[in-house]
From Swiss-Prot:
This is Carboxypeptidase Y homolog A. GO terms for molecular function: serine-type carboxypeptidase activity. PROSITE patterns: CARBOXYPEPT_SER_SER (PS00131). Its EC number is 3.4.16.5. The active site is at residues 266, 458, 520. It is found in: Vacuole. Keywords: Carboxypeptidase, Disulfide bond, Glycoprotein, Hydrolase, Protease, Signal, Vacuole, Zymogen. Belongs to the peptidase S10 family. GO terms for cellular component: fungal-type vacuole.
Amino acid sequence: MKFLTTGLLATAALAAAQEQQVLQAEDGMGQAPQRGSSIFDETLQKFQSSLEDGISHFWSEMKTNFKDYLPLISLPKKHTRRPDSEWDHVVRGADIESVWVQGADGEKRREIDGKLHNYDLRVKAVDPSKLGVDAGVKQYSGYLDDNDADKHLFYWFFESRNDPKNDPVVLWLNGGPGCSSLTGLFLELGPATIDKNLKVVSNPYSWNSNASVIFLDQPVNVGFSYSGSSVSDTVAAGKDVYALLTLFFKQFPEYATQDFHISGESYAGHYIPVFAAEILSHKNTNINLKSALIGNGLTDPLTQYPQYRPMACGEGGYPAVLDQGTCRSMDNSLERCLSLIETCYSSESAWVCVPAAMYCNSAILAPYQQTGMNPYDVRNKCEDMASLCYPQLNVITEWLNQKSVMQALGVEVESYESCNSGINRDFLFHGDWMKPYHRLVPSVLEKIPVLIYAGDADFICNWLGNQAWTDALEWPGHKKFAEAKLEDLKIVDNKNKGKKIGQVKSSGNFTFMRIFGAGHMVPLNQPEASLEFLNRWLRGEWH
């Protein structure tokens, strides 16, 4: 996850000038954000009288620093769309939407719910021998197209290595916002990694060992995805994910009958409550959603931000990164930070949520980032900030940018990048960063189990914060869950049986795990442990 700091004030998106809708309201984004200071002046004048003095001052500074010709949304990627004739399958959402059936009550209804007429799904059967990635495993890649909005989401599907006719299906989402899920594929939990010589190396701990896995580049303009428009908030992105899954399972009904689980890490702590709620809101669907998994996520900033100081100052199980003076400074800044987040929670307006993110990230996160330590792993220095402290991302990017790879996958953009900073900025300046998406979790828990897991060496979405928000969440099982004690989590599935890999607590449909010796990306640091808890979770343990 990339956290922007106040150094990006001058690049604020005018998207924030449009009032945001409260959570669960209808999506009313209106026209695309414009360039220039005139609309900024007009909108600022409209809202400034209702803002607190500090927040009003923030936006006044924005106006002063604003540049007329600054790009205000992430720029579209160069691309060439392949004709439908080059794809093995094309699924039309309009065809699905036109199918009506007779319900149990005798009334006619659509077979599958949702607005789908504007979506198509293009599918290519990938030849594993051309890429050397999990040879012998059935694979598909392609694009979900929103033809009305000119949006095109790339996906790559791997069938289970074990028993694909019966094994569950898992969707994997990386965070950012703006980071490609193909980084998760090749850096963390996919069937292969890429070595420094650009050779494909098999991963024995891949999550498709006992499940079929879909890696999705979302929102648009992330990874191999592209668009002439943009998505700048989590709710809008959820509509696309629902459409992708619906059309994919329509094309491949053999997977639709199996259990489906949605998973991800980092900013997926925002995505997954919204995406799961979107899927569960549809009564008639072909998505057999059974659970949700969030790894080292940002879900409830109001509860998580107070835990940054303890994690950085030696109270999270690892030596302190910051000196006592800096720790005291973070303590002194916390009250103002939490006040701003509370105001954001109350209004869910970009006018107050953006200042909350900017102030808190500057006062609470920046002191750690200035040390040169890896924000994703408190044990290590940051090797290369340009590659998010993981130089292997450069190798993965180089491999994915090979013409032979792009041709084999049916890619339509000219180049791949692991993370798009423009998307990160767009979400931040739409106020999405600090919004209370955790409020959707109780309704999700009513219908499916949820697992929150956290590597305990991560700073940026640390285990202390994730434990805190899960304990604080208001839901019918709150008291029992909060009172439950962490118990040892040990390996039971292989030759290392009995090895302690973490701690776990569970009550009702809610489970929290602390994974020892893992940073932000648990499958990267502890691949054996991650596959262990995944397999057991998919089998129904802890729920």
